[in-house]
Amino acid sequence: EFAKWLSPYAKLEVVELPDSTVAKEGLAILKSLERERNAAVVVLSEEGREFTSVQFAEKLGSYDRKIVFVIGGPYGLAPEVKQRADLLWSLSKLTFTHELARLLLFEQLFRATNILHGGSYHNP
């Protein structure tokens, strides 16, 4: 649902890679990112920086290029993927399935774009 709500604000493309070992998945992610050389890469990671929704909206608004978000598989992410990131972002100190992380990411993307466009979805 949030993906549909995002459509007025941003083009959204979901690329899923098959579950694999951390090393193989890392190589596949890096290969996929090769075609996105100019994009800002935001990797979701427990070790990442936490933001309030308003701070995240401001960060999102500061990028002047395409943004690629990376969510790891069930065994985490290869160090090389984290090193490729322009930003390591933590949704929470909790661990989520990648499906739930995607839903939370979509909701926060919608919330952030709504904040940036002066919408009424977010109540401070």
Language model regions located:
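Conserved nucleotide-binding/hydrolysis micro-motifs of P-loop NTPases
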Residues: 48, 75-76
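Rossmann-fold NAD(P)-binding glycine/threonine-rich loop
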Residues: 72
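S-adenosyl-L-methionine/SAH cofactor-binding core of RNA-modifying enzymes
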Residues: 10-68
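Long, amphipathic alpha-helical "stalk/connector" segments that mediate intersubunit docking
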Residues: 1-6
